[in-house]
């Protein structure tokens, strides 16, 4: 095992649930404002998951007051408190960039049975 792999192995989180593109998730993010720390929930659809190991990231998209908001999180970040899976999506693509152009009911993802 390489030295960097050993360092990476110690930084990996073991409480990350199995989720993928199309799933609707609640990401509980630790936000530090001054001396206070609070948890902010970001709920949306996972557009992609890329990378591997410590460098693995995922992108979540949501509509907020008619404006699309995307946020990319490192999977093993210490700033993420935890991730809840709201629903599983039934999609055939690994990257759901086409959802950026869709509005309303067309942007809805079928739920996996």
UniProtKB/Swiss-Prot annotation:
GO MF annotations, alphabetized: structural constituent of ribosome
Organism of provenance: Mycolicibacterium vanbaalenii (strain DSM 7251 / JCM 13017 / BCRC 16820 / KCTC 9966 / NRRL B-24157 / PYR-1)
Family: Belongs to the bacterial ribosomal protein bL19 family.
Keyword Ion transport: no
Entry protein name: Large ribosomal subunit protein bL19
Gene: rplS
Keyword Metal-binding among record annotations: no
Functional description taken from the UniProt entry: This protein is located at the 30S-50S ribosomal subunit interface and may play a role in the structure and function of the aminoacyl-tRNA binding site.
UniProt keyword annotations, A-Z: Ribonucleoprotein, Ribosomal protein
GO BP annotations, alphabetical order: translation
GO CC field: cytosolic large ribosomal subunit
InterPro entries: Ribosomal_bL19 (IPR001857), Ribosomal_bL19_CS (IPR018257), Ribosomal_bL19_sf (IPR038657), Translation_prot_SH3-like_sf (IPR008991)
Gene3D superfamilies in the record: 2.30.30.790
Organism superkingdom: Bacteria
Transmembrane segment boundaries: none
């Amino acid at each position: 095992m390489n030295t960097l792999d050993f360092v990476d192995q110690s930084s990996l989180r073991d409480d990350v649930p199995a989720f993928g593109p199309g799933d609707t998730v609640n990401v509980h993010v630790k936000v530090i404002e001054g001396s206070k720390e609070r948890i902010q929930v970001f709920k949306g659809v996972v557009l992609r998951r890329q990378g591997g190991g410590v460098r693995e990231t995922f992108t979540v998209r949501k509509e907020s007051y008619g404006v699309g908001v995307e946020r990319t999180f490192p999977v093993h970040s210490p700033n993420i408190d935890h991730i809840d899976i709201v629903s599983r999506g039934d999609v055939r693509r690994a990257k759901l960039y086409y959802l950026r152009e869709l509005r309303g009911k067309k942007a809805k993802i079928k739920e996996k049975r």
